[in-house]
Amino acid sequence: PGQVKLIFQPAEEGAPPGEEGGAELMVKEGVLKNPDVDAIFGLHVWSGLYAGQVYLRPEGIMAAVNEFRIDLKGVQTHGSTPWTGKDPIVTAAQIVNSLQTIVSRSLPLTEAGAVVTIGSIHGGVRSNIIPEDLYMLGTIRTLDNGMKATVLKRLEEIVYNVAKSNNIEANITYLVSYPITFNDPYLYEEILPTLERVNGKKNVHLMKAITGAEDFSYFQEKVPGTYFFIGGQKTDVDLSTVAPHHTPDFYVDDSAISTGIRSMVGLTLDYIFNN
């Protein structure tokens, strides 16, 4: 005998700016209490894998994410006399290039992966005016907490020192932040036979960690958990032609639903009867 709690979570992709949401808020509001949760399981469909296939790994399976905003403030001037102002655009270019040295020159990449990406730059309105203000938006993905600390430290060193060298004011604001999605190794070993039994051993695969992120990690910070992926593509489709997630042509075949149901029901029943 045991109890099963189903969590219906909003805002998996993050709450609107300035608001709380998703798994972090649910944990704060007591979703893992009354009754207390002993273990948690989650899954994610993947369009680039064949339906009927299950992929997982022990320990880190998805990266931590730290999204950030960099604000630069200079002195506006005419583009024909740049020496009369302070140029945030040139400074931004230097910062973007320098940030790419964090991964290539400051991290032991044979141990774990990391990504630093600037995805958006906003500044200026005319070709012949150097603007006063500029801001950039970026994301950091790390698969190791030590690397995460190093990347954040180097980010601040680079931004503030490059800005200072150009007489520019700089400020970093941290936005969305998710921990590493970490599969408890003991729970992983306990549930692996279940997944192999209900799906067929040949259909369950050990995967490499990926640099996507998932706020399911907030649940795993509180209780042992395992997160895994199921395929969602027809077996007669060339996977190299499949549209990725978050694109207009994204498609998942309905046959994936049975894999998900079979896996979650099997995990739930086996965990309850074995514990």
Question: Which residues make up each language-model segment?
Answer:
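Metal-dependent amide/peptide-bond hydrolase catalytic core
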Residues: 93-275
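Histidine/acidic-residue-rich, glycine-tolerant segments that coordinate divalent metal ions
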Residues: 1-120, 125-131
